[in-house]
Amino acid sequence: MSVNDLRPGTTFIYEGNLFVVIEQSFSKTGRQQGKVSVKAKNLRTGSRVEITFTGGEKVEKAMIERKDMQYLYNDGTDAYLMDTDTYEQIQIPMTRLEWESKFLTDGLMIKMTEYDGEVLGISLPDKVELEVTEAEAAVKGDTTSGALKKAVVETGLDIMVPLFVNVGTKVIISTTDGKYSGRAQ
């Protein structure tokens, strides 16, 4: 595919590495051939790079596959996922899921991204429901609006919650920033 066709979200292979386009811009000066500048994320390492191509240059388009998976459990080293269509189980090293592991509970439905049989990562739902396992006691008389206290949820994530949240309360947590979003119904 031509680099002129690169758009945000497009995946491509360049110098043996797998990238997804974050931003793209085209510039042309005078008689020179146009240049395409691309800010891209390396899908294997997570690093972000800026690549400048000469207009008309070619790159290989990468076909990324996204599958619905169910998180089963982790054994401390690997996380185990199950394909909900084929019931095939896949394991991913926990080191590749440092942020995501803070929100994974048994049975959680997620999306797994893979390329040519290689697992690149997982995508979590925007919000997850977790149970509070530890919470500081609310200070009597502390009625300041918006007052918060520390709490720990079932996955070990430390969060700040309103004073009315106690141990055993199910709360909704945003997976983008790890913050309290509300009380579960």
From Swiss-Prot:
- Look up the record and name the pathway of this protein: Protein biosynthesis; polypeptide chain elongation
Disulfide-bonded cysteines: none
Q: Which GO terms describe its cellular component?
A: cytoplasm
**Keywords assigned:** Cytoplasm, Elongation factor, Protein biosynthesis
**Per its UniProt record, what InterPro entries does this chain match?**
Elong-fact-P_C, NA-bd_OB-fold, Rib_uL2_dom2, Transl_elong_fac_P/YeiP, Transl_elong_KOW-like, Transl_elong_P/YeiP_cen, Transl_elong_P/YeiP_CS, Transl_elongation_fac_P
Q: Which GO terms describe its molecular function?
A: translation elongation factor activity
Record-level GO BP terms: peptide biosynthetic process
Localization terms from the record: Cytoplasm
Pfam families for the chain: EFP, EFP_N, Elong-fact-P_C
Q: Which PROSITE patterns match?
A: EFP (PS01275)
Question: What family classification does the UniProt entry report for this protein?
Answer: Belongs to the elongation factor P family.
Purpose: Involved in peptide bond synthesis. Stimulates efficient translation and peptide-bond synthesis on native or reconstituted 70S ribosomes in vitro. Probably functions indirectly by altering the affinity of the ribosome for aminoacyl-tRNA, thus increasing their reactivity as acceptors for peptidyl transferase.
Protein name stated in the entry: Elongation factor P
